[in-house]
């Protein structure tokens, strides 16, 4: 007589894997980046046009960094050089850097903070050039180096969020800055302006740049910026105070400048 087959209990159904997290980040379009590029191109066309038809580069005469004229009170020359360029190659290189670096930074910094950063980088760079270089100068590279400094601090302060990607990005930015400083050793390039822009970007972003955190209930998560307008104004105020003090010392003949 056949024995009944032993019944094998069914294995329990494995639990469903947890849903993948849905992470949203409030990114903006790089409107300011493209606006700055358009303004710079228009100004360069005016430079070329006045040079061609009048024999003088009127925008450069009115706005480039000239130490003696700044000492005489033309303080706008600590900002306006960022919209002026000396050649097609000069503006082409700077606008390419602005698009590559600026468009990504603006997405996370927001329009207002990015614009503030750009102007502060230019201000810091032109002040350092005013202090340490007797040569006239112009170009957006002061502001571009401000963006590089900001990018360094951004990835460093948010390294836990971005993980290994932050380390790679930080290494890339430092490498790009180092290469450009080496290029800046060539005659006719204002490395002091580059250094000042970098320092301004570092200071502003350390105190006022985005410091990101993840909030929400899993799996719906949001990337939020812990810093607000007060932090941005603090960072900007420190940059202005530091560089304006140095410029004032130079103008009044104080200190080692």
Labelled PLM ranges:
Residues 36, 40-47, 122, 176-184, ...:
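Alpha-helical transmembrane segments of multi-pass membrane proteins
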Residues 124-127, 135-158, 195-208:
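Specific transmembrane alpha-helix
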Residues 29-141, 186-191:
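N-terminal TM1-TM2 helical hairpin plus the immediately adjacent luminal interfacial "cap"
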Residues 167-179:
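Interfacial and helix-entry/exit segments of alpha-helical transmembrane bundles
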Residues 23-37, 112, 167-170, 229-233:
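Membrane-water interface of alpha-helical transmembrane segments
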Residues 25-26, 67-73, 107, 165-169, ...:
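Helix-boundary and loop/linker segments of multi-pass membrane transporters
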Residues 107-111, 154-170, 209-222:
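Alpha-helical transmembrane bundle and helix-membrane interface signal
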Residues 1-28, 181-257:
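C-terminal transmembrane module of polytopic alpha-helical membrane proteins
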